[in-house]
């Protein structure tokens, strides 16, 4: 077998990608130039891999590195090393050989070395579909990291959203408890609802504004307020009675007291203003006066 004079296309493109200073924020050499680090795997797979290798699969890139003898240095960082892949020593790339992969035949259990039948020319830029994983590809570097990073980002965003929703719900809960306490105090003080009845109301849930009056009437909280003497019927407060007293709960009218009508009041009215009218019987016997003969009738004022 003749000695290779040019590096494999995959190695050459990878070296150019790492050595490009314009992409150091995504992929670059380490400080001493003996390894290279992929700092941003998502941007690397999205922007750089399609430009150099016509695909965007970071896992395929890692598997291809494994077939050329690269190894992952630390588990928590995408840092790879090869003794013949160093900064400023591009000529060493020709010494990097593609590892031979062994495939088993379906008929009889014999194994054939696939790399032995392959020429040096076809072992270059076959990243992705043509290469099979070597035993070293089972290391952490072969994990589908871009997918996990995307999932982690989505989960982080969802977590922040849930935190905001939780804060908003906590604030609404405090407000609801405050309104509940006000309702219990009102029912106990003004409507005279027993504590066990309040517990039954609370177990049924907070009523809406439209059904609040029906619920209060159902538990017997508001009966006839005139009969209970809840309103002051004093004659000294006639002006207030003319206006009418109302009982509201959270803006819902529970009871309105109208002015009582006296037992001796005449119900006859005159005109639209409802003014009371009195009638006089001019034909009554007291309206007729008899005077002695010869004397004129006089009306005394």
Curated annotation (Swiss-Prot):
Gene Ontology cellular component terms for the protein in this record: nucleus
Pfam families the record matches: HSF_DNA-bind
Biased composition (Acidic residues): 233-243
SUPFAM superfamilies on file: Winged helix' DNA-binding domain
A molecular function GO annotation: DNA-binding transcription factor activity
DNA-binding region(s) from the entry: 7-101
Post-translational modification summary for this protein: Exhibits temperature-dependent phosphorylation.
Keywords: Activator, DNA-binding, Nucleus, Phosphoprotein, Stress response, Transcription, Transcription regulation
Family: Belongs to the HSF family.
Function: DNA-binding protein that specifically binds heat shock promoter elements (HSE) and activates transcription.
Protein name, entry field: Heat shock factor protein HSF24
Source species: Solanum peruvianum (Peruvian tomato)
Organism ancestry: Eukaryota, Viridiplantae, Streptophyta, Embryophyta, Tracheophyta
